[in-house]
Amino acid sequence: MGGIAFYEINPQLCNEMLVKAIASNRDGLKGVIGIDGSDHMGTMYWRNFIQMEMLIVSALQSAYGTDFGTSSYEGYRKTAKWYLYMVANSGLSFTYGDNNASVDIVPTMFYFSTLFDDPTLPYFEMQAAEKGQVKTGGGRTPTGTTESARTYPLILLWASKYENSSYSLPTDKVFAATEGKQPVVVARTGWSPEDQYLAIKGGQADLGHAHMDAGSFCYEAHGYRWVTDFLQDEYAQIEKAVADLDCGDLWDYSNGSARWKAFRWNPRQHSTITVNDAEHDALGDARIIEVSREDAAMGGTVDLTKTLNGEVRSAVRQAIIKDEEYLQLKDVIVAQADKDANVRWCFPTEAEVRVVAEGLELTRGDVTVLLSAITDCPVEYGIWANDPEKADFPSAFCAFEEKRETEFYCGFKVSIPASQTCEIITTIKKK
């Protein structure tokens, strides 16, 4: 933008600057946003990136009448739809990696809406405006104010095409972005907080800002989020632990790195499975192998075989909203010929949890749901603390990490004999 502003003062220098900037911007765009529109770093980083991107693109279009091919990139055309579906019915996002769940007003959703003539894209922005959740000091989120609102005035420019009544409700119940580095499938029965929302991811840990969370999922229903992803500790806390213990590099994403010693970054504290207490393979790429769009089974299937570090012969997880009524996960795991597979099936939750005869009972407000696992293998249900010292897998950095007494991990353990196949069907239903 500086090159545009000072072009008349020094045309040669500014022209060289613009040529390099346009070329590097296209390369950078493709590095961040996949061909399917997804950002492998998640929604929080996408918002930061896309707002700067839109300022550049808008400046080029205003000055030269063209964005020099940026908007022709397929991923660019799809990325706003990806973000729309990553926001759950509660107004919180599906989080993975270093992201948090807060969601801000995103002025660029109005830009994309006008550019691609899609009045569904700013759905959550319009909802926030109607509910008075637009805050002068920052964004909107059910838990407080987050990012700066310095770009809000751009809404006046980018939203001018539509009247308020022109924005419409998205109609697709299932959305899939399966070609990116962190593939996702999202299913929802509707768009109100009472409706159900499911998201599941694949991917790998050897990526910027990633966690060992392939196979993780998020589930909302009946006005509450039941399966979540806890907010991580501040970088400074973990960096101090790594430095004081002299145990490596926090930003090394390879297998065995100090990064995976952090309590809330390793696979045991995410809504996925671990086998034989082993970490995931940081290079193991879990791909979405099926997307189901039928009302009777909305969701997707992810192959976790490469993720589980050779501990099993194969592992496939299907997550669906069944008959638009309840959540169902089906994990089909084949043990190696020479060893048992001791599986820990877990997820983080802010609900009150107790073990009952039928499984796990989770309560939030006046709503209670029941988690039950059906399998031929013996099931041991459990509740584990969100405390690096008291968890069943204590953290190497526990003296530096935050202890949270009101958050829990819950799930179950299953032991699969060598060479055997075990199918585990887990449901979460309202009681």
Regions found by a protein language model. Give the residues of each.
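Beta-strand-rich N-terminal accessory domains
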Residues: 169-263, 359-369, 425-431
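Active-site-adjacent bridging/hinge elements
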Residues: 19-33, 193-197, 208, 310, ...
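Active-site lining segments of carbohydrate-active enzymes
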Residues: 1-48, 52-61, 140, 155-172
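Carbohydrate-active enzyme catalytic cores, enriched for enzymes
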Residues: 48-226, 289-297, 303, 417-419
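Flexible loop/turn segments at secondary-structure boundaries
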Residues: 102-103, 193-195, 206-209, 226-227, ...
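Short, flexible loop/turn elements at secondary-structure junctions
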Residues: 4, 189-191, 202-204, 273, ...
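CBM-like, beta-strand-rich accessory domains located in the C-terminal region of large
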Residues: 240-431
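Long, repeat-rich segments with strong aromatic
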Residues: 31-55, 60-64, 185-191, 195, ...
